[in-house]
Amino acid sequence: MTPQALHANWNAAWQALGVAAPDDALRLELQRRYGEPQRHYHTMQHLGECLAWFDREQALAERPGEVALALWFHDAIYDVHAHDNEACSADWARQALQAAGASGAAAERVHALVMATRHDAVPEGRDAELLIDIDLSILGAERARFDEYERQVHAEYGFVPEEIRLPRRRAILQRFLARPAIYATPRLHALLEARARENLQRSIAA
């Protein structure tokens, strides 16, 4: 996604909430976070891919501005040694929305959307379903991009010994494969489900 497209998405998201976009400092700080050196997958590449999906499918959202901002913040805090990244990112999102003058209800909904990216429960509501489907769209990517994604994830956890890391990674992929459906929205299910299952099966068998 081009810098111009990122800027346009950012401004449109705030406008949809009925508030002016904060000055560029917040957006640039988020982009700086996604460029941190410990990241290999959870980068501006991932954020740009997510926002590109959102731009194409935003008609599926009930509150599109909130979904877009949840995407911007969903990996804002990313420490591979921590277990509260989503909670910290969600708290930052809520604080940013409150500071910009968004309603308390909107801030809480965005907080909940970011927390849903823990992928530990079935998403509830159209916006959560769309957000999670977009976050998981990489599983249904073309083979070359999926394989790149797997390399990127392994690079982020390169400090974990391979004999521990590989079985853990297979177990995570197995859990996605075991779901009755990986994607909740009919649109993304139709576009990505079959290829996601092919990618997961191939990676698990490797």
Language model regions located:
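Divalent metal-dependent phosphate-bond-processing catalytic cores, especially two-metal-ion Mg2+/Mn2+ enzymes
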Residues: 1-16, 35-42, 52-61, 73, ...
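An amphipathic alpha-helix signature
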Residues: 7, 11, 27-28, 51, ...
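Short, well-structured alpha-helical segments
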Residues: 23-31, 44, 68, 107-115
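Short runs of predominantly hydrophobic/aromatic residues within well-ordered alpha helices
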Residues: 27, 47, 64-69, 110, ...
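Histidine- and acidic-residue-rich, metal-dependent catalytic cores
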Residues: 33, 89-121
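Active-site metal-coordination segments of metallo-dependent hydrolases
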Residues: 36-46, 78-91
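His-Asp-centered metal-binding catalytic motifs of divalent-metal-dependent phosphohydrolases/nucleases
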Residues: 50, 64-80, 89, 112-118
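Short, flexible active-site-proximal loops enriched in glycine and acidic residues
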Residues: 60-66, 82-85, 102-106
